[in-house]
From Swiss-Prot:
GO terms for cellular component: cytoplasm. Homotetramer. This is L-lactate dehydrogenase B chain. NAD(+) binds at residues 29-57, 99, 138. The active site is at residue 193. Pathway: Fermentation; pyruvate fermentation to lactate; (S)-lactate from pyruvate: step 1/1. It comes from the Eukaryota. It is an enzyme of class 1 (oxidoreductase). NCBIfam families: L-LDH-NAD.
C-alpha cells in the first residue's frame, strides 16, 4: 500500500545528495554558535554541520536551530561528535578549544589548544580533503600555523580570522570619535590578533583624506588628541568584554560570517586576516600574521602590498618575533 508521501509526490529524477555549500563549525560554545547563527542569517550554506564533544549541548543547539529553519534559508542542519558528519564541507570553521580567562593573554592559551587541534585537524582532512579551513580559536595566529602544519593544505586554504575583528573595532571607535559611520572610516589593524597588533595610522582615512596628514602626531605620544588611546582600546576591548560578560562572541561571529561571505560569493574583497608572511616585510620565520588579503572562491588568493612606515614595519616584525618565540617550542607538528 502506498504511503502518504508516495501518494503526495511523484518523483522525476533523484535529487543531489552532495551539498554545494556545506559549512562546518567545530565547537558549539559561545563563539561557535555566534558563528553558526551569523552564517545562517546571511544564508551562506545549504547545509550546516556542528561538531563538539559535549553531546547533550550539541544536540540541543542542533534542535534549537532546526526548529527555526522555517525562518532561515538553510533547512539542513546536522550535528554529531563524530567528525564524519563534516564530510564534503566547503569551509570548516574551527572554534574549538579552551576559553580565554579574564586577564589571560591569548598567547598563554597556546599549548592547551594545540593538543586539541592535533585530534581535530587530521579528522577534518580525512572527511573533507578539498575544504578551506578558517581558524578562529585563540591564539589564532599560532593555531592557524598549527592547522597549516597538521593539515598539509596549501597556505591559501588555511586562513586565520586574525585582525578582521580588530580592524572593525578600530573603525568603530574612530568613527564614534569623528561622528561618522564606520564604513566611511578606513583603517587597518595588522600583525598579531592580540597584544602586539599594529595600528597602521599612516593609512587611516575618510573619503581618501589622510587623517595623519591633518594631524601628523596622530598615533604618537605627542598627539594632544590622544588617538593612540583608540588602538589601546582595540587591544583591551576583548578583555573588557570578558570582564563584563564572561566571554566575547557576537562580534567575532559576525566577523567570521563576513569572511565566509567573501569566499562563498567569490567577492574578492580585501580583509585583514592571518596568512603565512615569511618573506614579507623582512620577516624570516614561518609565522602567520594579519595582512590585507584578497578572499575569493579559491581561498586567500593574494596579499596587498600595503605601504607602511618604517616604525610600522618594525612593529610588524616585533609582532612576528613575539609569535615565533612561542611557536618555535611547539612539539609534534
Amino acid at each position: 500500500m502506498a504511503t502518504l508521501q508516495e501518494k503526495l509526490i511523484t518523483p522525476i529524477v533523484a535529487g543531489s545528495t552532495t551539498p554545494n555549500n556545506k559549512i562546518t563549525v567545530v565547537g558549539v560554545g559561545q563563539v561557535g554558535m555566534a558563528c553558526a547563527i551569523s552564517i545562517l542569517g546571511k544564508g551562506l550554506c545549504d547545509e550546516l554541520a556542528l561538531v563538539d564533544v559535549l553531546e547533550d549541548k550539541l544536540k540541543g543547539e542542533m534542535m534549537d536551530l532546526q526548529h527555526g529553519s522555517l525562518f532561515l534559508q538553510t533547512h539542513k542542519i546536522v550535528a554529531d561528535k563524530d567528525l564524519r558528519v563534516t564530510a564534503n564541507s566547503k569551509i570548516v570553521v574551527v572554534t574549538a578549544g579552551v576559553r580565554q580567562q579574564e586577564g589571560e593573554s591569548r598567547l598563554n592559551l597556546v599549548q592547551r589548544n594545540v593538543n586539541v587541534f592535533k585530534f581535530i585537524i587530521p579528522q577534518i582532512m580525512k572527511y573533507s580533503p578539498n575544504c578551506t579551513i578558517l581558524v578562529v580559536s585563540n591564539p589564532v595566529d599560532i593555531l592557524t600555523y598549527v592547522t597549516w602544519k597538521l593539515s598539509g593544505l596549501p597556505k591559501h586554504r588555511v586562513i586565520g580570522s586574525g585582525c578582521n575583528l580588530d580592524s572593525a573595532r578600530f573603525r568603530h571607535l574612530m568613527a564614534e570619535k569623528l561622528g561618522i559611520h564606520p564604513t566611511s572610516c578606513h583603517g587597518w589593524i595588522l600583525g598579531e590578533h592580540g597584544d602586539s597588533s599594529v595600528a597602521v595610522w599612516s593609512g587611516v582615512n575618510v573619503a581618501g583624506v589622510s587623517l595623519q596628514e591633518l594631524n601628523p602626531a596622530m598615533g604618537t605620544d605627542k598627539d594632544s588628541e590622544n588617538w593612540k588611546e583608540v588602538h589601546k582600546m582595540v587591544v583591551d576591548s576583548a578583555y573588557e568584554v570578558i570582564k563584563l560578560k564572561g566571554y566575547t562572541n557576537w562580534a567575532i561571529g559576525l566577523s567570521v560570517a563576513d569572511l565566509i561571505e567573501s569566499y562563498v560569493k567569490n567577492l574578492c574583497r580585501v580583509h585583514p586576516v592571518s596568512t603565512m608572511v615569511k618573506g614579507m616585510y623582512g620577516i624570516e620565520n614561518e609565522v602567520f600574521l594579519s595582512l590585507p588579503c584578497v578572499l575569493s572562491a579559491s581561498g586567500l588568493t593574494s596579499v596587498i602590498n600595503q605601504k607602511l612606515k618604517d616604525e610600522e614595519v618594525a612593529q610588524l616584525r616585533k609582532s612576528a618575533d613575539t609569535l615565533w618565540s612561542i611557536q618555535k617550542d611547539l612539539k609534534d607538528l
